[in-house]
Amino acid sequence: MDNGLKVILFEKLPEGDLQMIEERVWSMNMVTALEHVNYIVVGGREFEAVEGRLNVDEGKLELLLVPMRTEG
């Protein structure tokens, strides 16, 4: 049975610091979809996925996201 993979989303702030947005289990279908997408919507905000890191020690996929600029 597939329990998915824990994914941690980090936002890169303008100052260069990282802020954790969330941590949740993704299905393997969602993880596989990362091969085909550049943008992720979470909490009603759109981000560009710029890097990913597989943390084997903790069994987690860590994604670095940059917020998209919105004109308003």
Could you tell me what each predicted segment is?
Residues 1-34:
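N-terminal acidic leader/helix
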Residues 56-67:
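Short, solvent-exposed secondary-structure boundary/capping segments
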Residues 8-10, 50, 64-66:
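A structural detector for beta-sheet-dominated domains
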Residues 45-55:
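Short beta-strand-centered aromatic/proline hotspots
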Residues 2, 68-72:
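Glycine- and charge-enriched low-complexity intrinsically disordered segments
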Residues 4, 49, 60-62:
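Broad gene-expression machinery/nucleic-acid interaction feature
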